Amino acid sequence: MGKTGSVEHTKQRIESELMPPSMYKVILNNDDYTPMDFVIEVLARFFDKHEPQATDIMLTIHHQGKGICGVYPFGIAETKVLQVNQFARENQHPLLCTLEKA
């Protein structure tokens, strides 16, 4: 009887090891003060977006209130959020970067 529990535990552990990591959307939120050019710079610098794609995302942020910059595993998403928010504050902009589960 003891083996059944052990087999189930091993099966659950293997299944959890095979699961892909949870993914998170990194989002830029609109505000009335951050210049559009700065948002484009953030998208290029931190998310490797070329100007046409960065402009499209910036316009989505402007018109819809937020835009997705990318989808990443939690650790990467969290780092990008921290980097963007720090960069915005260093440049005296209220731009807010957040993450949510994809």
UniProtKB/Swiss-Prot annotation:
Pfam annotation, one family: ClpS
InterPro entries according to UniProt: ClpS, ClpS_core, Ribosomal_bL12_C/ClpS-like
Annotated GO biological process: protein catabolic process; proteolysis
Stated family: Belongs to the ClpS family.
UniProt function note: Involved in the modulation of the specificity of the ClpAP-mediated ATP-dependent protein degradation.
Subunit structure: Binds to the N-terminal domain of the chaperone ClpA.
Protein name stated in the entry: ATP-dependent Clp protease adapter protein ClpS
Protein species of origin: Shewanella denitrificans (strain OS217 / ATCC BAA-1090 / DSM 15013)
Taxonomic path: Bacteria, Pseudomonadati, Pseudomonadota, Gammaproteobacteria, Alteromonadales
Recorded name of the encoding gene: clpS
